[in-house]
Amino acid sequence: MTPATRAGERPLRILAISGSLRARSSNTSLLRLAVDVAPDDVEIVMYDGLATLPHFNPDDDVDVPPAPVAALRAQVGEADGLLFCSPEYAHGVPGSLKNALDWLVASLELPHKPVALLNASPWATHAQASLVETLTVMSTRIIHEACVTIPVARGDVDADGAIESAEIRQGVRAALDTFAGAIRSRTATRP
């Protein structure tokens, strides 16, 4: 029996956010794999609204923000943790992901939220560091032990965007186990 099934507890809910808008993105494929290999007591939900967010404008960040922004904030608020996987463009994160984070800066949903980062490319170190810096400034709780690089080559992703490599599957599952354990530990120690 898993911890989430004891005494009617709900599974941990993790929101997975890909920094890529590409249809066959290795980053999105890695997050979809996380959905497939997640422990039974962990529910991973893919965020699919990145392309629908308007460009961030503080003048539009009002009591009733644009609907896609409100939806993003609601999903972040409902999540026990956030799982990011992003490509690197010009030594940084893609503008679409940074835009989403900008919409979360003034919201109350993000501070102290546990975060883990998957990196699908061993060469995307600048984006990973940039994302860590941005999320740290935004007062998230980065679980460094669950932040891992799991190289995904083009040949690892099939025509449907699935990854079947046992090694990659095991790496993602290990990161999720670490992340879920850290979230539960944090929840158990709250006053």
Segments the model singles out, each with a brief description of its role:
Residues I14, N27-L31, V69, P94-L97, ...:
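A general structural signal for well-ordered alpha-helical segments in protein cores
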Residues G49-P66, D156-D158:
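N-terminal beta-loop-helix "entrance" segment that forms/cooperates
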Residues V64-S139:
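Helix-loop-strand module that forms the ligand-binding subsite of alpha/beta enzymes
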Residues T2-L15, R141-P191:
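Glycine-rich phosphate/pyrophosphate-binding loop and the adjoining helix
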Residues A38-V45, R141-I142:
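A generic structural motif
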Residues R6-D41:
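N-terminal beta1-alpha1 ligand-phosphate binding loop
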